[in-house]
Design a protein with these regions (language model features):
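Contiguous, small/hydrophobic- and glycine-enriched helical/loop subdomains that border
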Residues: 1-92, 111-114, 120-130, 134-137, ...
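Residue-level recognition of well-ordered beta-strand positions that form the cores
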Residues: 28-30, 96, 179
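Short linear motifs in intrinsically disordered
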Residues: 58-60, 154-161, 177-183
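Active-site beta-strand/loop microenvironment that shapes enzyme catalytic pockets
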Residues: 93-104
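Cytochrome P450 core scaffold surrounding the K-helix E-X-X-R motif
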Residues: 102-113
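Polybasic "coupling" helices that flank or enter modular domains
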Residues: 129, 143-170
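Conserved RNA-binding domains used in RNP assembly and mRNA/RNA metabolism
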Residues: 146, 163-210
Length: 210
């Protein structure tokens, strides 16, 4: 595991810049899972973050597909999973987790409407060390459960706030619109189009349709 309190070149999905000010919690977990468990890593990380924030700070969280953790509808944490394959085997996987803990989000007006922090929500600082310990304990519990074959998509599904709602999904140059009907055990979004057909989407940017 690699742990940092600040990043100068934080990176999110699709190579996007991730604002990583002092006061946050930024960690990368290095794993060597089997190929069949690779897709579950984002689910595991998202659930671990949500459980840790709720357990330590008492804040109610929700998840935004595919890799964001929200509080009061604003992003409080993001997850990035990358891996390297050698043939059909996983050489290693990196799960990066960034949590806005004691960051003053008002200092970043460009993201303030969309992002929040634990301190912003509580009005006080919390121990980043305690949050990191709780997060890693939850991650280990979930990871070992997944390795033992225990499904966790039901909890993930229950925490996804956009299921059952009309959404727009943008991935690359493509856009799909429809009802966010479900997610499968690999974390793919099942979208039901207006004509009744279904699309299975592995990744993309989701927004609610007005």
């Amino acid at each position: 595991m690699v742990l940092a309190g600040r990043q100068t070149a934080g990176r999110g999905r699709l190579g996007r810049f991730w604002i990583s000010p002092r006061g946050g919690l930024y960690l990368t977990v290095v794993l060597r899972p089997s190929a069949e468990h690779l897709k579950s890593l984002v689910i595991i990380a998202a659930l671990a973050v949500a459980r840790a924030i709720e357990g330590l700070a008492g804040l109610q969280t929700s998840l935004k597909w595919p890799n964001d953790v929200l509080v009061a509808g604003r992003k409080i944490a993001g997850i990035l999973s990358e891996s390297e394959l050698v043939g059909e085997n996983v050489s290693h996987a990196l799960v990066g987790i960034g949590v806005n803990v004691n960051a003053d989000m008002a200092a970043y007006p460009e993201t303030a409407p969309l992002a929040t922090s634990v301190m912003t929500e509580l009005g006080r600082e919390v121990s980043r060390e305690a949050l990191a310990a709780r997060l890693l304990n939850e991650f280990e519990t979930l990871y070992l459960a997944a390795q033992a074959g225990k499904p966790m998509d039901e909890e993930w599904r229950a925490r996804l706030g956009m299921l059952g709602k009309e959404v727009r999904v943008r991935f690359g140059e493509q856009v799909e619109e429809g009802l966010a009907e479900d997610v499968d055990s690999d974390g793919n979004l099942i979208l039901r189009r207006a004509d009744g057909s279904r699309a299975t989407i592995a990744a993309g940017d989701v927004t609610l349709r007005s």
